[in-house]
Amino acid sequence: VRDKRTIENYGTNILGVQLAIPAMLSLFDKYGVKGTFSTVGFLFANNKEELLACCPEMKPQYTEENLSPYNSFDDVGHNEQDDPYHFGYSLLQQIKENNNHEIGSHTFCHYYCLEPGQTPETFRQYLLAANKIAAANGIVVRSLVFPRNQFNEEYLSVCREVGIDSYRGNPASWLYAGRNKNDENLLRRAFRFADTYLNLTGHHCHTKEYVMSSLL
């Protein structure tokens, strides 16, 4: 969210994750819930040196340069103790050690699949980098949540190539169809908000059979 938020106006929310994850794991254990935590590969790094070593060599050349996190790497601290805003290695270890949940991919560092300037190949490199650092931590990644719900059907073949066999899509309505930053508008956001309370677009639940038939 760094292109839209700052530590000054959003930092409290980020630090809140340090409390939220343990609380969620405790509740999941209590009620027998199994969850998927889709995580950027960035957060698998234990320190900045490891992070830099794992970054994909090929990076997206977004038309809007502010979308690229690499322009702000000088602001990243050394490790989680030094910079809890950018690192969360201990939280991932808590999820992993719980043994009841899946850790999925959110790409390496919030890859935006509908923004101008990026390509299928840079997307593939982001997924491979995320898979590699996850594997170094003993985790096999099989699922993906597209950052900002920028679902791009043309990229599903890339997902298959790197071992992703399931993904979170968007509800079948124009309100939820993937859009890039410039194509999003307040009207759609307002209708999505209203849909939360008024069910404007119908139910979006699916049977197990439907889900299984849609796997990559």
Language-model features: locations:
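Catalytic alpha-helical scaffold of carbohydrate-active enzymes acting on polysaccharides/glycoconjugates
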Residues: 1-143, 148-215
